Amino acid sequence: GHAAANCALARVATALTRRVPASRHGLAEGGTPPWTLLLAVAAVTVLGVVAVSLLRRALRVRYRFARPAALRA
């Protein structure tokens, strides 16, 4: 799951880096950014938030289980 998410993030990141210069040029001329770029940015932010929340939850569970053992010792 995490590996697939990382691969997807890497693909989106490479796609974004390829599209960003063109979109910057378009913005400089007063054009609106393409919807695909906006959707890609939204997808990256959503994936990032989900990944962070999952990591926090996993760390919380581990910490919760580890704490009583540490207190007993």
Curated annotation (Swiss-Prot):
Location(s) in or outside the cell: Virion membrane
Virion surface topological intervals: 1-34
Chain segments annotated as transmembrane: 35-55
Keyword flag Transmembrane: yes
Bilayer topology term: Single-pass membrane protein
Keywords linked to the UniProt accession: Membrane, Transmembrane, Transmembrane helix, Viral envelope protein, Virion
Intravirion-side segments: 56-73
Chief localisation class: virion
GO terms for cellular component: membrane; viral envelope; virion membrane
Family under the similarity heading: Belongs to the chordopoxvirinae L1 protein family.
Name of this chain's protein: Protein F9 homolog
Lineage, highest ranks first: Viruses, Varidnaviria, Bamfordvirae, Nucleocytoviricota, Pokkesviricetes
